[in-house]
Amino acid sequence: MKIDIDERIKNHYDLTPLTTFKIGGWAEFFILVKNQQELIEAINWAKIKKLPRLFLAGGSNILITKKKLRGLVIKISGEEYSVKGNIISVWAGTSLSKLAGITAGLGLSGLEWALGIPGSLGGATRGNAGAYGSDISGQVAEVEAYDIAKGE
C-alpha cells in the first residue's frame, strides 16, 4: 500500500528527544518509517528533491549538532519480525533489548547480553554492538540492504 509521503514529512523537526543523550538540534525535514516500503518511499522522496538523507533508529551512540541538519532525517522505527524454525527475521527498527526478550521467549539463545542495551537492531548491526564478551556479529546470518543509487 502506497503512503502519502508528502503528508507524513514534518518540517523543522526537533531531534532532541530522539537520542539517548537528549541533546541536539533539528531536522530540515523528518519522517518516521515503520517498514521497508515506507523506508524506500522516504529515500526516493529525498532523492527526487536532491536532499541528503540521515538515518536514525534507536538514537544511541549518536550526537546531533545544535545546528539545522539539512535534508531528510529518516527515523527507522517499528518492530516487525517473523520466525521460521530457529531463524528470526527482524526489521532494523526493532529495539535490541526487546529482540533479546523475544528470542529468549522463543527459546532461542545468543542475545542474552543485549537485554538492557539501548538502540535498535539496525544500529547495533551497523556498529557491531556487544557486551559481556559477545556481539551482534555472532548472531546475524544475513542482512538485507537497499542500494539507493540503483533503487533496489
Regions found by a protein language model. Give the residues of each.
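FAD-binding subdomain of flavoenzyme oxidoreductases
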Residues: 112-114, 123-152
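Anion-binding (especially nucleotide phosphate/pyrophosphate-binding) glycine-rich loop
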Residues: 1-121, 125
